[in-house]
Structures are given as C-alpha cells and as structure tokens.
Amino acid sequence: TLLASGFNPVPFRAGDPGATTATAAADGTAAADGTAAADGTAAGTARSNRAGGEAALFERALAASRAGSFAAALPLWDQVLELHPEDAAAWSNRGNVRLALGDAAGAIADQGQAMSRDPEHPDPHLNRGTAEEALGRWQAAAADYRWILERDPQDASALYNLGNVNGSLGDWPAARDCFAAAARARPGFAMARSSAALASFQLGELEEAERQLRALIRRYPLFADARAGLTALLWRRGASGEAESHWVAASGLDPRYRQPDWLLRVRRWPPEPVVALEQFLALAPQAAARPVGVTP
C-alpha cells in the first residue's frame, strides 16, 4: 500500500492501467497514519500500449511505490514519464510518491498533469486533495472531493476525506455526516465508523459514540483506534477501570496513540477525545506504564 506521512486522509489511489478501481482500506486498519492506500486505477495509457521493457518498467515503479520504497520509486516514475509523457497514470503515481516524500507542491503539480490528460477520471482529484490537505488548503481539497462526489455520491474515499476537511474546519456535524456516509457506502470501512463515533464524542453525544465504538471492537478486536477512543470516552464517563483495560490493548497494538500531536495532526481525532485521553494518561499512570499483556 502507498502511505504518505503527516496527515490522514483516506487514500490516494495508485494507478495500474487496465485494472478496475479497488476500494480503499476497507477494514480501516491501514488508515491510522498518513494515507491509507487504495490499489486502484489512476487514469492513463492502456497496458497494451506498452511493449515488453516499458511495461516492466511501469510495473517496477508501481511495485516500489506499493512497497513504500518511495526514494527508489521516484526515479523509476521519472523514466516512465520520459518514455510516455502522456501517461496520466504515471503522472498521478509519481505525484503520490512525491507526496509520500514530503513534496506536496510537486504532488499537486503532477496530479494536475494527470487531470489534463484524463479530465474525467476521479483518482487524480482524490490524490490532489490529499496533497492539498497536507498544505492546509482545506477549501481546495474540499473542492476536489466534491468534484468526485458530484459524479459518484457513493465514493467512500472522497466522503471520508471530505469529513476530515470538515473536521479541520471545525464543522464536526458535517464531518460526522461524511464519515457516516463513507461507512454506509463501503461496508466494513472501520476507520470511517470510528471517525463518526469520535465526531459524536466531540459533539457531546457520548452514548451514541460508546455504542458505535463497542460495536466496532466486537467486530474488530484488534482495532486500536476504536479501543483508544473507547478508553478516552470511558474515562470521561468515570469508568476508569474499564478504560484501563481497553488502553492496555490499544497501546500494545499501536503506541502512537500516546502522542497527542499525532492524534490531532496525523490521525485527525477531534480535540475533545484527545483531551480526554491526555487526562487519562496523566491521571492513570499505572495504566500508561503497565507492560503490554498485563491486565488489571
């Protein structure tokens, strides 16, 4: 999968000409840092238009990208584009790699090149939106996601990313609506369901948030996001013993949930759950320090 750092929209989509667009991170487990990737299709030259070595070069570049070997993938995409400058998929994929390497402006430029070559394909808009989010260009990102949703109102990735944008703008009711719509559009999209629950937490609807988080944990017992969210919620509601039990599991699954800055900037939690989890960690040091696997 392709992962970019520093923010958490669901996913840019990887180009593989001739493939059908796949769904993104359906179980939600890959969405907890950067961008959870969907191995789908960015627009571009059909596979049949590449002969032997050129097709192999494209596949090498794609494989390196999916493996997270971004520094190795970038020059491979450069070579592909030297041979096929009209290949929209290659432009979009190179843009994804540039974003993963921290070059959001370069990523936006590459996605624009992809759009100019295949104006009606949604993936470059999704990918450009993630890069715009990395730069805090919320309105520009929202415009890209809405462009997709005007054409496909059930695009779960665009709905989820628009929810993140709404949250960044402080509109948590709209964010929750988008997350819930993303979860309906893609059954099994656990991160969307968790984000909707956390938005309910932010809005003071603790019973609804607790119901959603418990349902997620029953279905995905190893889903750290839901366990960390339920830890914060239970602490806020005064159920400290059960909060500690869930924290043992959450922190063992993913220690980044100890980091408030990561929660706010990368995972994109709302502020109220972050504050509650910080209070839990400050006032329940025995839970924060307990070795993984030791239950209260």
Could you say what each language-model-derived stretch is?
Residues 83, 117, 151, 184-185, ...:
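Structural marker of alpha-solenoid helical repeat scaffolds
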Residues 10, 249-296:
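Terminal, low-structured helical/coil segments at or just beyond the last alpha-helical repeat
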Residues 55-66, 75-78, 89-100, 109-112, ...:
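Conserved alpha-helical positions within TPR/SEL1-like repeat arrays
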Residues 218, 224, 228-258:
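TPR/TPR-like (Sel1-like) alpha-helical repeat modules
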Residues 1-78, 82-83, 292-296:
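N-terminal leader/linker segments that initiate helical-solenoid repeat arrays
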